[in-house]
Curated annotation (Swiss-Prot):
It comes from the Eukaryota. Changing Y359 to A/F/H: Abolishes enzymatic activity. It comes from Oryza sativa subsp. japonica. Involved in serotonin biosynthesis. Catalyzes the decarboxylation of L-tryptophan to produce tryptamine, which is converted to serotonin by tryptamine 5-hydroxylase. May play a major role in serotonin biosynthesis during senescence. Accumulation of serotonin attenuates leaf senescence. Catalyzes the decarboxylation of 5-hydroxy-L-tryptophan to produce serotonin. Serotonin binds at F104, H214. PANTHER family: GROUP II PYRIDOXAL-5-PHOSPHATE DECARBOXYLASE, TRYPTOPHAN DECARBOXYLASE 1. Forms homodimers. The gene is TDC1. Its cofactor is pyridoxal 5'-phosphate. Pyridoxal 5'-phosphate binds at T175, S176, T273, V380, G381. It catalyses: L-tryptophan + H(+) = tryptamine + CO2; 5-hydroxy-L-tryptophan + H(+) = serotonin + CO2. Changing S106A: Slightly increases enzymatic activity. This is Tryptophan decarboxylase 1. Changing H214Q: Reduces enzymatic activity 20-fold.
């Protein structure tokens, strides 16, 4: 086993300063280190387009290149930065690359980076209002701004024109957390409603989602203690463009109720990961209301598009759901991690998650006039996430953010038209936002004579494309068929990147088919 080398000669190149006091926040060092870090970031964004999107490294490569044990003695920061450049960057998958089309984007911006940097420097831990009033109030303000941009009902806002509302929001790390905390709240409400003593009735609770729902939902259900046998995955098909069919949902919920189970929670998705399908929010809410089940809307990706009036209809009926989450870190120029969860009645959430140890008690919390965000999440500690979201909205404004969304959608439309213009390919599902699902169609050539052959041809096309380093695309399975996903939205992408990727796809396909 490896061990810490305490021999000073092993690190003779990095001598420790004799008699120097350790000052990790020395003002001169902070300025020097951050200047170098900012220069690195700026250079990275200038050069990332020329880097292979996918790295050519093997598992364990980094331990072979860097020290297996931590150094005993100090090293100049320049040495640390040199190792970052020489060893870490070559092993990165470059999500910031304009040639990255594989997954939903992790967008970023100068304002978000600055906000995240400042929040990290302040390093506040705003678990209660008193622990950092500005951190809590900034988060509340940013969430209410975003709620207005999304035209959410005031019932989801922390503050209304009449003062503090009954609803509100919290910024979490991921959609997984948003689903987990709302599942816990729904679970507890259903247990109370069914007259169960504690968790004794947990085995009777049932939850529902379409088979296109993100896997994180099914994971969160297990974490919340739901019996896997009662987690319903409702089949979808081409007849509903792979969105959840309210009639099938009603059938499943009614069958469970008739069997003595308690329908507890329904997850509707606006913009599924596989194909960008949209579940009909209003109709789903109407079905769930028959059983007093909690309805959550997962709009992690496509929720950002709903700041544009032309996409807002995808949230119609949201006033009848219990919670909704969306992730600005996907498509709203705000770096990871930033998932915004809104609930119509915060008391239902805090009732399940509240903790009040003696050492956290204070007059502000006891007054009921403030929000203690620790009571809307799993943990207690939390980052100052609201700052970067506020800085993005304050710096760019609604119009620029809408322009960003519309530009990505327009570029996706360009790609969709290019695909439709080549009879070797087909667009598999309607393009609702900025994701195009396409494939080499069966019958396009000898290498794709049957549907099964076409599946293999598409798999080979994806692998060949990704090996070039010039583009990165991913796949999914829709209707039993292997499909390529082309997701537009990287912050540095322009139309010429989309067209270049298409030329590479055409060229590679021609080489394969011949």
């Amino acid at each position: 086993m490896g061990s810490l080398d305490t021999n000073p000669t092993a690190f003779s190149a990095f001598p420790a300063g004799e008699g120097e006091t350790f000052q990790p926040l020395n003002a001169d060092d902070v300025r020097s280190y951050l200047h170098k870090a900012v220069d690195f970031i700026s250079d990275y964004y200038k050069s990332v387009e020329s880097m292979p999107v996918l790295p050519n490294v093997k598992p364990g490569y980094l331990q072979d290149e860097l020290r297996a044990s931590p150094p005993t003695y100090s090293a100049p920061f320049d040495v640390t930065m040199k190792e970052l450049r020489s060893s870490v960057v070559p092993g990165m998958t470059h999500w910031a690359s304009p040639n990255f089309f594989a997954f939903f984007p992790s967008t970023n911006s100068a304002a978000a980076i600055a906000g995240d940097l400042i929040a990290s420097a302040m390093n506040t831990v705003g678990f209660t209002w008193q622990a950092s009033p500005a951190a809590t109030e900034m988060e509340v303000l940013a969430l209410d701004w975003l709620a207005q941009m999304l035209n959410l009902p005031t019932s989801f806002m922390n503050r209304t024109g009449e003062g503090r509302g009954t609803g509100g929001g919290v910024i979490l790390g991921t959609t997984s957390e948003a689903m987990l905390v709302t599942l816990v709240a729904a679970r507890d409400a259903a247990l109370r409603r069914s007259g169960s003593d504690g968790v004794a009735g947990l085995h009777r609770l049932a939850v529902y989602a379409a088979d296109q729902t993100h896997s994180t939902f099914f994971k969160a259900c297990r974490l919340a203690g739901f019996d896997p046998a009662n987690i319903r995955s409702i089949p979808t098909g081409a007849e509903t463009d792979y969105g959840l069919d309210p009639a099938r949902l009603l059938e499943a919920m009614q069958a469970d109720a008739d069997a003595g189970l308690v329908p507890t929670y329904v997850c509707a998705t606006v913009g599924t990961t596989s194909s960008n399908a949209v579940d009909p929010v209003g109709a789903v809410a109407d079905v769930a209301a028959r059983f007093a089940a909690w309805v959550h809307v997962d709009a992690a990706y496509a929720g950002s598009a709903c700041i544009c009036p032309e996409f807002r209809h995808h949230l119609d009926g949201v006033e009848r759901v219990d919670s909704i989450s969306m992730s600005p870190h996907k498509w709203l120029m705000t770096c990871l991690d930033c998932t915004c969860l809104y609930v119509r009645d915060t008391h239902r959430l805090t009732g399940s998650l509240e903790t009040n140890p003696e050492y956290l008690k204070n007059h502000a919390s006891d007054s009921g006039e403030v929000t203690d965000l620790k009571d809307m999440q799993v943990g207690v500690g939390r980052r100052f996430r609201g700052l970067k979201l506020w800085m993005v909205m304050r710096t760019y404004g609604v119009a620029k953010l809408q322009e960003h969304i519309r530009s990505d959608v327009a570029m996706a439309k360009v790609f969709e038209d290019l695909v439709r213009g080549d009879d070797r390919f087909e667009v598999v599902v309607p393009r609702n936002f900025a994701l195009v699902c396409f494939r080499i169609r069966a019958g396009a050539g000898a290498a794709a004579a049957t549907e099964e052959d076409a599946d293999e041809a598409n798999r080979e096309l994806m692998e060949r494309l990704n090996k070039t380093g010039k583009a990165y695309v991913a796949h999914t399975v829709v209707g039993g068929r292997f499909v390529l996903r082309f997701a537009v939205g990287s912050s540095l992408q322009e139309e010429h990147h989309v067209r270049s990727a298409w030329e590479l796809i055409k060229k590679t396909t021609t080489e394969m088919m011949n």
